[in-house]
Amino acid sequence: MTVFHFTGIKGSGMSPLAQILFDAGEQVQGSDVDKYFFTEQPLRERNIPIFTFNADNIKEGMTVIAGNAFPDDHPELIRAREIGVEIIRYHKFLGEYIGNYISIAITGAHGKTSTTGLMAHVVGGYKPTSYLIGDGTGAGHANADFFVMEACEYRRHFLAYNPDYAVMTNIDFDHPDYFANIEDVYSAFQSLALQVKKAIIACGDDEQLQRIQAKVPVVYYGFGSENDFEARNVEKTTEGTKFDVFVRNEFYSTFFIPLFGDHAILNTLAVITLCEYEGISPDIIQDRLHTYKGVKRRFTETDIGDNVLIDDYAHHPTEIRATIQSARQKFPDRELVAIFQPHTFTRTQAFLQDFADSLSLADTAYLCDIFGSARETQGALSIQDLASLIEGSAVITTEGIDILTKHQGAVFLFMGAGDVHKFQDAFEAVLKNDETA
C-alpha cells in the first residue's frame, strides 16, 4: 500500500485531506514545524504520525502531497525528486480526488469555512458525505455520495477544481500580496465559474457576483427581492435567528438557526438553495440546522465565571464587522472587548483604516503584534500604526494579559488568523487562577 506523506500536514486544507484519506483506509503520515496548531488535534486523535521537517522522512514508494506554502527547493521535495517519489500539490490532488463524488465547492472571500461546515452537516443528514473544512477538520466515507469542500481563491488555487456545484458567498478584495485589485479577484471567480459542471449558487446581494457568467445555471440567494431564494421576515433573538424563505416569490418554508448575524442567514440560504436543487426536503434541512454546532474558530464560545470568551478566525475588516454584529445580537447588554491580531503585513497595510473602523465598533479594542506569514516575516509598519487610528486602544502582550480583567462580565472577542489563541489561553489561565484564589 502506498504511504501518503503530507509535507505541511498542519495546513488548514492539508490536515483535513489527510484525515479524509486516513478514514478511507489509506496509510497516512506527514511533517510540519514543531509548533502547535489547532489543525493537528484531529490528526493526533487518529494517531496519524507527525514528524518535523526532514529529508529523511521521504522513502521510496511514497506519494508526497505538498502544501502550497512550500517551494520546490524544500528539503523533503528535493529528496523526493532524487529518489523518484511522486510529488503532487495539494490542490491538484484534491481536484482529481473529488471526481469520484457529487462535488460541492464552497468559495468566497468570507464565509467559506462556516458555509462548508453547515453544508456538510445538512447534506450529510441526507446521504453519506465526505467533507474538507478549513477549520482543520475532514471526514471520509467509503460510500459517500457527496464531497463538500472549501475552495480558496488565493493564488487561484481553486482553478484546480472542476466541481459539480460552486457556492460563491461573496467577492471582496483580500490577499493583497497576490491580487492587484477587486477586478483581479473577480477574474479568478469568473474563471472558476466556467469550470462548474451543474450549477452555481451565488449571493445575489453581492454586486460582483451579479456579473458572473457561466455555461450552467446561476441561482441567486440573498435578502434582495430580485434573488431566486430570498430571506424575509427575519426575527433575531439572543437564542438565534428565524426567517422565511421564498423561492421566486413563492413561500418555501420557515427556518430557525442557532446562529447570529446577517452573514449566518446568508450562509444558511446558500445551503438551502443547494439542497432544494438536489431535492433535499425542507424537513431534513430544518432538522439538521437545529443540530448544527458550528466549526472551530468561528464564534467559538468559552464561559469562565461571568465572562464570555469568543475565538474567531476574523482577519479581514468585513469579517470583524460580522463577528461584532453576531456578538451584539447574542449579547445585546454586554460590553464587547475586541482583542485582534493582524495577519500579514501586506494585509494590515492594505486595510489599515478599514481595520481601525471595524474594530472601533467594539466598546474597547486591544491589539497584538502583527503575525507574519510563512511568506513574510516583517514589514514597513508596526502594530502602533493601527493603534494610533483607534481611540482608546492599547497594545497587549501575553505577559500583560491581566489588563483585560478590568472588564468584568464582558464578552471578549479574540480575533485573528495567526496564533491569537495564545492570548486567549493566557487570559483563561488568569481568570481560572482568580476563581481558585
Swiss-Prot record:
Tell me the Gene Ontology biological-process terms attached to this UniProt entry. cell division; cell wall organization; peptidoglycan biosynthetic process; regulation of cell shape
**Record keyword Lipoprotein present:** no
Where found? Cytoplasm
EC class name? ligase
Residue sites binding ATP per the record: G108, A109, H110, G111, K112, T113, S114
- Gene3D superfamilies membership: Mur ligase, C-terminal domain, Mur-like, catalytic domain, NAD(P)-binding Rossmann-like Domain
Q: In which pathway does it act?
A: Cell wall biogenesis; peptidoglycan biosynthesis
Name the catalysed reactions: UDP-N-acetyl-alpha-D-muramate + L-alanine + ATP = UDP-N-acetyl-alpha-D-muramoyl-L-alanine + ADP + phosphate + H(+)
Q: What is its EC number?
A: 6.3.2.8
- Enumerate the Pfam families for this protein: Mur_ligase (PF01225), Mur_ligase_C (PF02875), Mur_ligase_M (PF08245)
Recorded GO MF terms: ATP binding; UDP-N-acetylmuramate-L-alanine ligase activity
Instruction: Give UniProt keywords alphabetically.
Output: ATP-binding, Cell cycle, Cell division, Cell shape, Cell wall biogenesis/degradation, Cytoplasm, Ligase, Nucleotide-binding, Peptidoglycan synthesis
Q: Name one GO cellular component term.
A: cytoplasm
- Main localization category: cytoplasm
Biological function: Cell wall formation.
**What is the similarity comment for this entry?**
Belongs to the MurCDEF family.
Q: What is this protein called?
A: UDP-N-acetylmuramate--L-alanine ligase
What organism is recorded for this protein?
Lysinibacillus sphaericus (strain C3-41)
The beginning of the lineage is: Bacteria, Bacillati, Bacillota, Bacilli, Bacillales
